[in-house]
From Swiss-Prot:
<dbReference type="GO" id="GO:0030259">
    <property type="term" value="P:lipid glycosylation"/>
</dbReference>
<dbReference type="GO" id="GO:0050511">
    <property type="term" value="F:undecaprenyldiphospho-muramoylpentapeptide beta-N-acetylglucosaminyltransferase activity"/>
</dbReference>
<comment type="pathway">
    <text>Cell wall biogenesis; peptidoglycan biosynthesis.</text>
</comment>
<comment type="function">
    <text>Cell wall formation. Catalyzes the transfer of a GlcNAc subunit on undecaprenyl-pyrophosphoryl-MurNAc-pentapeptide (lipid intermediate I) to form undecaprenyl-pyrophosphoryl-MurNAc-(pentapeptide)GlcNAc (lipid intermediate II).</text>
</comment>
<keyword id="KW-0328">Glycosyltransferase</keyword>
<comment type="similarity">
    <text>Belongs to the glycosyltransferase 28 family. MurG subfamily.</text>
</comment>
<dbReference type="InterPro" id="IPR006009">
    <property type="entry name" value="GlcNAc_MurG"/>
</dbReference>
<keyword id="KW-0132">Cell division</keyword>
<keyword id="KW-0573">Peptidoglycan synthesis</keyword>
<keyword id="KW-0961">Cell wall biogenesis/degradation</keyword>
<keyword id="KW-0808">Transferase</keyword>
<feature type="binding site">
    <location>
        <position position="196"/>
    </location>
    <ligand>
        <name>UDP-N-acetyl-alpha-D-glucosamine</name>
    </ligand>
</feature>
<dbReference type="InterPro" id="IPR004276">
    <property type="entry name" value="GlycoTrans_28_N"/>
</dbReference>
<keyword id="KW-0472">Membrane</keyword>
<keyword id="KW-0133">Cell shape</keyword>
<dbReference type="InterPro" id="IPR007235">
    <property type="entry name" value="Glyco_trans_28_C"/>
</dbReference>
<keyword id="KW-0131">Cell cycle</keyword>
């Protein structure tokens, strides 16, 4: 039986593509393994998926670009993670390793390279993060959402890999009619999506301006915090959704989102009006700011700095999007930067030598 190892974690964005590819390998009879942090979001997501995946937990550390005593400890954690990964991969003897990035992916990538296992990695952002900069040195091939410098000879530019448009599931979740009964059909609907680590700013904005917002809009707020769950007049707040995600997206006139590339390209593929509020440099390396500027320059989106986000500025930006809806939708419709999961899977299998 052929075997493949997946790795990647730390945020949902470092797991999503793996969970889209894994079922295709399982359907072809592959034995699938996943190396990550047993206490990380990758383990949680793999378990939630219900997929037949063998999960292996390793030590992980975050290498920082600035001096920190924590770095010294984390170097040892990464080293131990490499030793653990060497043992795991040597026992599995896989045909390939696929990495979606995040610091937990560095030890398995290094170990696979040392064991002469082909390593395939994916980079979603405009510029590589530190983890993938390290991983690139050990990779067989890197696939990128955005074009990368020609000097990176192992890179294949594939565009954004998204599942949008690949499902015909039109089943109405049982919660949807109840939600709709609380909404005013004459008002536009705003959907706030903060991702696994960026919802707090949106949550605070809505909590502080709930009455004013719900006078003008139906508000859907994916909070990541179950203590905020609420269904009221023109307001639906929920911590997490699965089968409701696409129906709620379909309801929205405008989506207010962070700047993660996975979410951005899903919105572009759906031709969904959106306002980007990227995570600032105090909370990230600035990749979301770069993604947001890129999307705005392409005419797909509008973006606003987190420090400038207020009730008043939100009204201005949403009004601008709605007034020029045709412009943004047409630009998204003309995008050639989207690739289906099936197309990417076929490319990956071809590069793996089938």
């Amino acid at each position: 039986m052929k075997k493949i190892v997946f790795t990647g974690g730390g945020t949902v964005g470092h797991v999503t593509l793996n969970l889209l590819l894994i079922p295709r390998f399982l359907e072809e009879g592959w034995e699938v393994h996943y190396i990550g942090d047993g206490n990380g979001i990758e383990h949680e997501q793999v378990v939630k998926s219900g997929l037949d995946v063998h999960f292996h937990s390793i030590a992980t550390g975050k290498l920082r670009r600035y001096f920190s005593f924590q770095n010294m400890l984390d170097v040892f954690k990464v080293g131990f993670g490499v030793l653990q990964s060497l043992t795991i991969i040597a026992k599995i003897r896989p045909q390939a390793l696929f990495s979606k990035g995040g610091f937990v992916s560095v030890p398995p990538v290094i170990a696979a390279n040392l064991l002469r296992v082909p390593v395939f990695i994916h980079e979603s952002d405009l510029t590589m993060g530190l983890a993938n900069k390290i991983a690139y040195k050990f990779a067989t091939t890197m696939y990128s959402t955005f074009e990368q410098p020609a000097s990176l000879t192992k890179v294949k530019h594939v565009g954004a890999v998204t599942k949008v448009g690949q499902t015909n599931d039109k089943v109405t979740p049982i919660q949807l009619p109840e939600i709709l009964s609380h909404f005013d059909k004459s008002l536009p609907t705003l959907l706030f999506v903060g991702g696994s680590g960026g919802a707090k700013v949106f949550n605070d904005l809505i909590s502080q301006n709930s009455a004013a917002l719900t006078e003008r809009f139906n508000i859907i707020n994916l909070t990541g915090d179950s203590s905020l769950n609420k269904l009221d007049k023109n307001l639906y707040r929920v911590d997490y959704v699965t089968e409701l995600y696409q129906p709620l997206m379909d309801l929205a006139d405008v989506v207010i989102t962070r700047g993660g590339s996975n979410t951005l390209f899903e919105l572009i593929a759906m031709q969904q009006l959106h306002l980007i509020v990227p995570l600032g440099r105090q909370a990230s390396r600035g990749d979301q700011i770069e993604n947001a500027l890129y999307a705005e320059k392409k005419g797909y989106s509008k973006q606003i700095d987190e420090s400038q986000l207020t009730f008043a500025s939100l009204l201005v930006e949403v009004d601008e999007l709605l007034k020029h809806k045709e412009f943004y939708v047409q630009n998204m419709a003309n995008s050639n930067e989207i690739q289906s999961v099936d197309s990417f899977y076929n490319l990956l299998r071809e590069d793996m030598g089938r």
